[in-house]
């Protein structure tokens, strides 16, 4: 494959830094990025899009609902997953930077069998942090682990190493997947997102979704599912219940069967419904789960009139002629701590 040049960007965060330091708007963009560089681009590559600075375009350069954004609301700014929808992101050239935990094979290579990641300086060298901050991106990840799994991340790290590692790998992938699904759903104003970033520059729990040696981390597989050309997923619409989504970004019409299941663990199916679905190329389909079910089942567990009837909602898309689902999405109405796991938290 060949490298293709599509966009030329003048700089990264120059306008943002000037604005955050309190400079007036006339000082955010200097003549080189405002006049000289775009003139050169027009002369030599008039076919390309020129962006003076990333981020830029809003009332403030770092405003995320206009122009080009850097979105770390879900992430460094510790906002809840709902912020991805509230912020109205239109396009983000950087987003969802987390300290993604590598696989055990790399941990063993780094520290010897059985040694746990923690506060040791040699481990922290591989954990990203912003200059001048009192926290790093491992603190960010542990914040969400505590919030989503209702456990004390610090205590868990020392008391149950295996569970801590499993949840740290899972939580960053889940946050990325949920955010991207929010942006891909029908009605979203978002037209694209670039993850920060692909590959770690050194061994450790870096921003990369693959480690420094090219081995995918858990987050990579969550992204693979949520960014697939053909995707099926569920979103929580509050008192309106769960919504079912199917996205077809391929050049071909999708034909097949969509199946929604509500599952009560460990082994009961409380509801199951299937329907034929045909979806044109480059299109989206959305329907409320309540419209597919025969009666009200509080799919998002928003009304809470009694005990939760299902811990997992599963949506599967199976293409015509295939024996296995081509896409799947899941929701956890009662939270991510499932009955079989609750003893360990």
Q: What does each model-found stretch correspond to?
A:
Residues 2-63, 171-174, 213-214, 218:
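Active-site neighborhood of glycoside hydrolase catalytic domains
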Residues 6-7, 43-54, 61, 191-192, ...:
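Acidic/polar loop patches that form or flank catalytic/metal-binding clefts of enzymes
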Residues 39-42, 78-246, 250-252:
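Substrate-binding clefts and catalytic carboxylate motifs of secreted carbohydrate-active enzymes
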Residues 241, 253-259, 312:
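Exposed beta-strand and adjacent loop surfaces of beta-rich binding modules
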Residues 246-248, 262, 317-319:
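Hydrophobic beta-strand positions in extracellular immunoglobulin-like domains
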Residues 249-256, 268:
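A short beta-turn/strand-edge loop motif at beta-sheet boundaries
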Residues 256, 292-344:
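Terminal connector regions
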Residues 259-306:
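Intrinsically disordered, low-complexity Pro/Gly/Ser/Thr-rich segments with frequent PxxP/GP/PP motifs
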């Amino acid at each position: 494959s060949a490298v293709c040049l599509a966009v030329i960007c003048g700089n990264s965060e120059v306008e943002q830094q000037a604005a955050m330091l309190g400079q007036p708007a006339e000082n955010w963009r200097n003549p080189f990025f405002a006049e000289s560089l775009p003139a050169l681009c027009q002369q030599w590559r008039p076919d390309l899009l020129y962006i003076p600075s990333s981020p830029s375009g809003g009332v403030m350069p770092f405003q995320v609902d206009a122009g080009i954004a850097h979105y770390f609301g879900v992430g460094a700014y510790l906002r809840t997953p709902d912020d991805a929808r509230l912020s109205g992101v239109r396009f983000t050239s950087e987003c969802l930077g987390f300290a993604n935990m590598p696989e055990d094979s790399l941990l063993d290579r780094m520290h010897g069998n059985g040694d746990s990641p923690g506060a040791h300086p040699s481990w922290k060298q591989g954990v990203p942090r912003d200059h001048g901050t009192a926290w790093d991106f491992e603190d960010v990840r542990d914040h969400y682990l505590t919030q989503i799994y209702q456990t004390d991340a610090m205590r868990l790290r020392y008391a149950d190493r295996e569970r801590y590692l499993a949840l740290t790998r899972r939580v960053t992938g889940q946050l990325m997947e949920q955010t991207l699904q929010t942006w891909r759903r029908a009605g979203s104003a978002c037209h694209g997102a670039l993850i920060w970033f692909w590959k770690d520059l050194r061994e450790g729990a870096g921003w990369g979704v693959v480690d420094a040696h090219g081995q995918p981390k858990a987050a990579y597989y969550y992204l693979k599912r949520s960014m697939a050309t053909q995707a099926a997923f569920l979103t929580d619409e509050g008192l309106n219940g769960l919504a079912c989504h199917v996205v077809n970004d391929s050049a071909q019409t999708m034909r097949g069967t969509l199946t929604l299941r509500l599952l009560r663990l460990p082994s009961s199916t409380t509801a199951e419904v299937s329907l034929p679905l045909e979806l044109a190329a480059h299109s989206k389909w959305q329907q409320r789960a309540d419209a597919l079910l025969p009666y009200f089942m509080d799919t998002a567990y928003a009304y809470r009139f009694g005990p939760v009837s299902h811990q997992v909602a599963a949506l599967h898309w199976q293409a015509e002629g295939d024996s296995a689902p081509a896409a799947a999405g899941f929701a956890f109405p009662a939270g991510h701590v499932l009955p079989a796991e609750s003893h360990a938290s």
